[in-house]
């Protein structure tokens, strides 16, 4: 079985092939999300605590959280479910997935290091992979650099160098939820437009009601005139 071990603190990942069934026995009958001590896996993992995050069987079917079964099952999946990406709006499909219980017929088991042990693991805990992109949302940038609301966030955006041919230039992400005088002015203009439209609708409704009352009054007078003429003709 292959173990895909990740260390989120450093952003590193490493694959290890283990053929000895006795070393893997500690993972059997465990569920996704459970923590397992790594002492029995090998001496280099002494003191480590792993968290089971997923896996695939020999045919490539992924493990699905919440399915309490050690084998494959067929589930009707829709948008929002893991292990399925709908191609059309509202599409559902019955797909084969593995349960969340670890069994012997898995080919890959994904683990995450929760607690580091005594020894360093080469290529996993002794190196650090820097994040490629910085925060994008305005509040996240403020939190990242410890800024106040008075500071201009645009000066602190993490830029990255891009080389295209002979040219080297920097790129910065578009800051999301950035509050500027221009956005506030747009918000005020939109609010004023809504108020103006509502007032126009009220004026139009009042004008229509006035016109309708006038037409009803004219029709009432016409009917009264017709009745009066009819009564006079009957008398004569």
Swiss-Prot record:
Query: Matching PROSITE patterns, A to Z?
Result: RIBOSOMAL_S6E
Q: Name one Pfam family in it.
A: Ribosomal_S6e
Q: Which InterPro entries match?
A: Ribosomal_eS6, Ribosomal_eS6-like, Ribosomal_eS6_CS
Q: Which residues form the signal peptide?
A: none
Task: Provide the GO biological process annotations.
Answer: translation
UniProt keyword Cytoplasm present: yes
Family note: Belongs to the eukaryotic ribosomal protein eS6 family.
Record text on subunit structure and interactions: Component of the small ribosomal subunit. Mature ribosomes consist of a small (40S) and a large (60S) subunit. The 40S subunit contains about 32 different proteins and 1 molecule of RNA (18S). The 60S subunit contains 45 different proteins and 3 molecules of RNA (25S, 5.8S and 5S).
Q: What is this protein called?
A: Small ribosomal subunit protein eS6
Which taxonomic lineage does the organism of this UniProt entry have?
Eukaryota, Fungi, Dikarya, Ascomycota, Saccharomycotina
């Amino acid at each position: 079985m292959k173990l895909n071990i990740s260390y989120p603190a450093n952003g590193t990942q490493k694959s290890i092939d283990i053929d000895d069934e006795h070393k893997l026995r500690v993972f059997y009958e465990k569920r996704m999300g459970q923590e397992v001590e790594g002492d029995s896996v090998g001496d280099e993992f002494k003191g480590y605590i792993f968290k089971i995050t997923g896996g695939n069987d020999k045919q490539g079917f992924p493990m699905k959280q919440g399915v309490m079964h050690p084998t494959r099952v067929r589930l009707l999946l829709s948008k929002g479910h893991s292990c399925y990406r709908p191609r059309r709006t509202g599409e559902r499909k019955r797909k084969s997935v593995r349960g969340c219980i670890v069994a012997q017929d898995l080919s890959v088991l994904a683990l995450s290091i929760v607690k580091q042990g005594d020894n360093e693991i080469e290529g996993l805990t002794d190196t650090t992979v820097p994040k490629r992109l910085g925060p994008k949302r305005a509040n996240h940038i403020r939190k990242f650099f410890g800024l106040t609301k008075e500071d201009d966030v645009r000066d602190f955006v993490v830029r990255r160098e891009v080389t295209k041919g002979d040219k080297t230039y920097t790129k910065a992400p578009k800051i999301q939820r950035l509050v500027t005088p221009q956005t506030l002015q747009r918000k005020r203009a939109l609010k004023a437009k809504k108020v103006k439209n509502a007032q126009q609708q009220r004026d139009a409704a009042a004008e229509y009601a006035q016109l309708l009352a006038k037409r009803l009054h004219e029709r009432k007078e016409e009917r009264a005139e017709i009745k009066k003429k009819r009564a006079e003709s009957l008398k004569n």
